[in-house]
Amino acid sequence: MSFRTVCTTLGASLELNFFRVCNPARPTTIQDWLQERINAVAASISDIRLLLRVKSLPKSSESRRVFITGGTGYIGSALIPILLERDHRVRVLVRPGSKAKLPAACEVVSGDALDANTYRQVIRPSDTFIHLVGVPHPSPAKGAQFRAVDMVSGREAISACAELGMRHFIYLSVAHPAPLRIMKDYIAVRAECEQMIQERHLNATIIRPWYVLGPGHRWPYLLLPFYKVCEWLPFTRAGALRLGLVTLEQLILALVQAVESPIQGTRVVGVPEIRSAALNLPREITRQTA
């Protein structure tokens, strides 16, 4: 049985549960409210653990000026404190009137991620641009939203950075190709944005996780035995590694590594590289300071 067949069968059986997790309803019972509070505490503990780990790592000798779109979401809110801890200067784009809570040490600028004309003039003097904008809680029913938000915001960011000659563009994409058709629109939009990056000749790092494990996103731990078997079998190994699970901590460290090691041309960071970022980050810093 091929990895495609296994994933298609498994995906069909888990699709309903997957999208119930990704699209939780507003809390309507005490149990729902308690679960939200538990998730919030778990997120705080996870953030503290990650911060302590980062504190133990050597710092880069060069501070970056980083501009972030989508910085108030699940990934961005975990990434920003880590970049600040590592002495990078962070400027975050937020919607006008947004009450998003961001660390006091970062600079907040207002603009619309769907229209680069509202923020192009405040990107500089940043040398690194991280694009994290995406429709929250993605599901197959949100194909139109992926094109209206993910595609448009990506196109605007890519265009603005190409015009400004941005030193390094970092794009959070998704692992592909993938056999599961349930997220084909989501994957297609990110593949198109990757193509735009290539066409505009940006110096870019494209990061391709599949599913990110973290607070409120832990049910796929149940799939780990399945993944281990598929990674062990020669005929399913490549697909299992490409579409493997990564933790929020691993993804944040991969983003930090990308920030601190700009590239000429295009670099694609897949699941295996994301998983090894915690090991590679100290080595890269040692190499830079040697």
What name fits each language-model region?
Residues S98-E156, A160-E163, A178:
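NAD(P)H-binding glycine-rich loop region in Rossmannoid oxidoreductase-like domains
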Residues S2, V6-R65, L281-A290:
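Non-catalytic terminal and boundary segments that flank Rossmann-like NAD(P)-dependent oxidoreductase
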Residues T69, L93, L132-V133, F169-A175, ...:
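SDR active-site strand-loop-helix element
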Residues S173, Q195-R218:
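Conserved beta-loop-beta element that borders a ligand/cofactor-binding pocket
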Residues P215-A238:
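NAD(P)-dependent short-chain dehydrogenase/reductase
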Residues L243, T247-E249, L253-I285:
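Core catalytic loop region at the nicotinamide-binding pocket of NAD(P)H-dependent oxidoreductases
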Residues P58-R86:
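N-terminal Rossmann NAD(P)H-binding glycine-rich loop of SDR-like oxidoreductase domains
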Residues V149, S153-G154, V189, W219-Y221, ...:
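Substrate-positioning beta->alpha
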